[in-house]
Each structure stands twice: as structure tokens, then as C-alpha cells.
């Protein structure tokens, strides 16, 4: 017997008004919880709550505390859920005991779904770190559905550990360099972020746009306060270029030890952080093109030296184009098909050789065609010969 029938029986048996009200409230509460659960139910994981509908209200009707992490939503049972959006569709990543654990699950999914430009709660994985590089390869070797399934089943760390062991077993040991010290500059660098340059970044604008989240985190600027209070005046000020931060000079050292100086500033008109002066010379010398990546690093020591590195995409070789060009030239320079001449009764009969096909099927068709042509030519020759004989006898 369900709760509704119990309430009806209680009401029919002459229960007090207070009991009726309590039973009705309990029935209403049960219906509300059931409705909220169905609204936030995920088909792939029954019982998972989303960030819409009833997820902001607990059993007593109060609001749940919001999370400070991206992609993390609180649950009425005190646990924390993680989710990510893919093509405007919510992908539920599972329910976790701790808020930080749910945030790490979101970071894993974000780096698989978004790639190197993913915005994460904690430090993103970098290829410069050997451990992180192994995890990046592990994520790249798994599909999005497989990563989501591992996160939901809480088996991601176990699968990652097994993959690291297998990778270490088949990888050769790194060469030993006694002269190198653990305090070398390359080992002490901290990877900040990578920026994939766009056509406008390497064009004639002479500027590189730094993503806002990375700029405010790693290269903060003291922006001037707004000088106007009117929205119309503020818009006019922005259109005129007012409010722009003059910026500072940042020194970056590349892999060859050369120091590059860039002017780093904030453009109020486009509300973007940019590297301007010195950037075009860097693009020209490094040969950057759209799609190449630029990495930014900082020394882990007290000097906080900045480093810059280029990751140029492999350009397609021209061997295939050269081979195609040579084949086209050879085809154009090929001699015309041979022409056979047959002299019959003082008349030259010209017959052109049929082109040969390369494949076996084409060869068979050509052979049959030749036979038909030979038969037709022989019949024509017989008729022509007969006419010539009759003409000679008359």
C-alpha cells in the first residue's frame, strides 16, 4: 500500500484535523521531492541532480550553498555533483563526497572536452610536466564517453594509475646526465598557459590578445578607475580610446636565451589584454602562422623570470605536390599515340592505336573493343576491296 492510500485510509477512519494536515503536508512534500528528483534526473545516471529546478532547495525548502568551483553544484543530500556542457547539452559527471573532488572531476572532463584552452579550477595539465604529459596522453587515447563513464564510476584514478604503470614498463629509461643539476632553469620553470595564435594575432594589427582569465591571473594590471559616471559619456570615452591602461614592459626569454620585450596593456575599447610593441618582430623571426601555439612560463625561484616558447605546427611537405607536378609535365610531354598506315591498292588507310588502360578491368575492356574494331575494319576492308576490284574490271 502506497503513502497516498495510507493517507486516504487515515482520513476515512476519522483522524483528527491536525493529523489530516500533517498527512497532507507529508504527501505534498513527498510529491515535491519526487517532482524535483525527476526534474534533475540524468538518464545515464539515475538519481543525479542538475543545476536547475530543485537543486537549489533542500528538504526543508532552504537554499543550498553555491559552490566556488566551476562546474560543481550542491546536492540536497550534502554531496557535490559535477557537470559540463557540450554543445548546449548537459553532461552529468557524477556525485562526489567532497567539493574539491567534484571540481577535479570537472577539470578532467574540461581538458578532454575543451583541450589545451580549457578553463579549469586547478592548475591545468602541461606537457612540460612528465606526470601531466602521461595523463594528457591517457585522456587523448580515450573517447569523451569513456572519460565520462570513468568519472561517474569513480574509476578514473585507478585507470590512470594502470596506464602510467604500463607506459613506464614499455618506455626506455631516460639518459643520465651527471653534469645536469636538478636546479636547472628548464626544470625550475612553471608553465602558465598556452595561447593558440589566430590570424589576427599574426596579421598587421601588431598585437597578441591574452585570454582574460590568464591575463588577470598571471599578469595583473592596475587599471585606472572610470572617470565618467554617465553611461553615454562612458561609451563615448571608450570609443575615443579613453581609459586604456598604458601598460608595462614585460621581458620574456626564449629557448635560445634571447630576451624579448613586449608592451603589455589593457584596451578599454575591446576590453582585452594585449601584447603590442615588439610582438610583430617576434612573429616575423619565429615564423609564426595561425594555428601555432605560444607558451608562457615563469621561473619557480624568487626572480620570477618570464619565459616564452613557440610550438610551430608541422607544415605539410611539398613532395606530394612536386610529384603531382612532375606527373602532369610527363603526361603533357608524352608522345602522341602511334598511327599505323596500311597501303591498299594505292590508297593509304590510317589507323590510330587505341590507348591502353592501366588496370586489369580496363585492359579486358580494351581487348574486347580492339576485337570489335578489328572485325569492323576487316568487313570495311572487304567491301572496299570488292569495290576497287569491280572498278578495275570495268
Curated annotation (Swiss-Prot):
Localized where? Nucleus
Q: Per the record, where are the segments of Low complexity compositional bias? A: 11-29, 178-187
GO terms for molecular function, please? DNA binding; DNA-binding transcription factor activity
**What's in the GO CC field?**
nucleus
User: For this UniProt entry, what is the primary localization, expressed as one broad class?
Assistant: nucleus
The name under which this protein is listed is AP2/ERF and B3 domain-containing protein Os05g0549800
PROSITE patterns found in the cross-reference section: AP2_ERF (PS51032), B3 (PS50863)
- Bilayer-crossing regions: none
User: What ranges does the record give for the region Disordered, renumbered to this chain?
Assistant: 1-75, 168-188
What does the UniProt keyword field contain? Answer: DNA-binding, Nucleus, Transcription, Transcription regulation
Pfam families documented for this protein: AP2, B3
Q: Note the DNA-binding span(s) on this chain.
A: 68-123, 193-314
InterPro entries for this protein:
AP2/ERF_dom, AP2/ERF_dom_sf, B3_DNA-bd, DNA-bd_dom_sf, DNA-bd_pseudobarrel_sf, LEC2-like
Q: What is the lineage of its organism?
A: Eukaryota, Viridiplantae, Streptophyta, Embryophyta, Tracheophyta
- Give a yes or no for keyword Transcription regulation in this entry: yes
Q: Look up the domain of life of the source.
A: Eukaryota
